[in-house]
């Protein structure tokens, strides 16, 4: 699926513009409109982010998070990636499952 079936392209562009210099997942989730989406739509977004279909979003996929929204977006740096993981990985297994993702978006 495509991310634009769930999110508005204008909102995505605004959210990406805010991430140019630094990434804050909460700001991104709110600006992109993710926080208002149903669990079913969040699961769709999760499936897009889970590029290797492992059922989890791992560190390498978090690093490329923004590129799921725009191919030309930057990679997250190590500090941003680690903070993003820490925010979502409530069971501390080093990756983010779909329920953890939904909880992080709605937090």
UniProtKB/Swiss-Prot annotation:
Ca(2+) 1 binds at residues 50, 52, 54, 56, 58, 61. Keywords: Allergen, Calcium, Disulfide bond, Metal-binding, Muscle protein, Repeat. Ca(2+) 2 binds at residues 89, 91, 93, 95, 100. Signal peptide: none annotated. InterPro entries: EF-hand-dom_pair (IPR011992), EF_Hand_1_Ca_BS (IPR018247), EF_hand_dom (IPR002048), Parvalbumin (IPR008080). It comes from the Eukaryota. One of its GO terms (cellular component) is cytoplasm. One of its GO terms (molecular function) is calcium ion binding. Pfam families: EF-hand_7. Residues 37-72, 76-107 form the EF-hand domain. Belongs to the parvalbumin family. PANTHER family: PARVALBUMIN, PARVALBUMIN ALPHA. Monomer. Homodimer; disulfide-linked. This is Parvalbumin beta.
